[in-house]
Curated annotation (Swiss-Prot):
Cellular component GO terms held in the UniProt record: cytoplasm
Compartments reported by the entry: Cytoplasm
Binding site for S-adenosyl-L-methionine: 10, 45, 66, 123
Matching Pfam families: TPMT
EC number: 2.1.1.67
Coiled coil location: none
GO biological process, alphabetically ordered: methylation; response to metal ion
Family: Belongs to the class I-like SAM-binding methyltransferase superfamily. TPMT family.
Organism from which the protein derives: Shewanella frigidimarina (strain NCIMB 400)
Protein name as catalogued: Thiopurine S-methyltransferase
Length: 219
């Protein structure tokens, strides 16, 4: 999957993956991570997610990484936030006092950028990748998360042959196979959300399971 795919989606505003409300699992389970106020939370492939605004409202500082410039700019403008822009070798850095978004490739994000995080949140990153790239992403994510840091992972699972991703189906077995080498994994909840997703219903997808996991980076 080439970067041009995502750039085109944002340019055409074909962003069905963007949710117009905070994810219910985030609201329900974020307290399970047990972070204090004023701690930093990493959000990979963040888009312009309202979930970041929610995390900021919980008095965390938010560190995101997003490939597309328009997505980053829209996050700040949609929320009425004035930002500053700086540059690193590989990324353009948009920041306010509480939110810093690295615009660029997550695979070139340096470990130093996430060295001080205390938590992380992945709702739309893991499920954005087809199989081979998803495995590469897991390795990249694990490299960016310091030891013993916990976060939430939200996945979708369905019969992949019934719908062309993204989002791509990620099963509990896949999570078990590919994340447990790097993370302790705890399934918190899994529910069928097909009735809330017309796109999947219109394609006659028989079921759509949304799951939330607590991940803790192994030492």
């Amino acid at each position: 999957m080439e970067p041009s795919f995502w750039h085109e989606k944002w340019q055409l505003q074909q962003i069905g993956f963007h949710q117009n409300q905070v994810n219910p699992f985030l609201v329900k389970y974020w307290s399970h991570i047990g972070l204090n106020e004023n701690t930093e939370v990493f959000v990979p492939l963040c888009g312009k997610s309202l979930d970041m605004f929610y995390l900021a409202e919980q008095r965390h500082t938010v560190l995101g990484c997003e490939l597309n410039t328009l997505a980053v700019e829209q996050f700040f403008t949609d929320n009425g936030l004035t930002y500053q822009v700086n540059h690193t070798d590989e990324h353009v850095v948009f920041s306010t006092d509480q939110v810093t978004l690295y615009q660029g490739d997550i695979f070139t994000l340096p470990k130093s950028a996430t060295a001080s995080i205390s938590g992380f949140y992945d709702r739309a990153a893991l499920i954005a990748w087809p199989e081979e790239m998803r495995q590469q992403y897991v390795k990249a994510l694990a490299a960016l998360i310091p030891a013993n840091v916990s976060g939430l992972l939200i996945t979708l699972d369905y019969l992949q042959e019934t719908l062309k991703g993204p989002p791509f189906a990620v099963s509990p077995r896949w999570v078990e196979s590919y994340l447990t080498p790097y993370f302790d994994v705890e399934l918190l909840e899994c529910v069928d959300v097909l009735a809330d997703n017309p796109r999947f219903m219109n394609k006659h997808v028989p079921w759509l399971n949304e799951a939330v996991y607590k991940l803790t980076r192994k030492s």
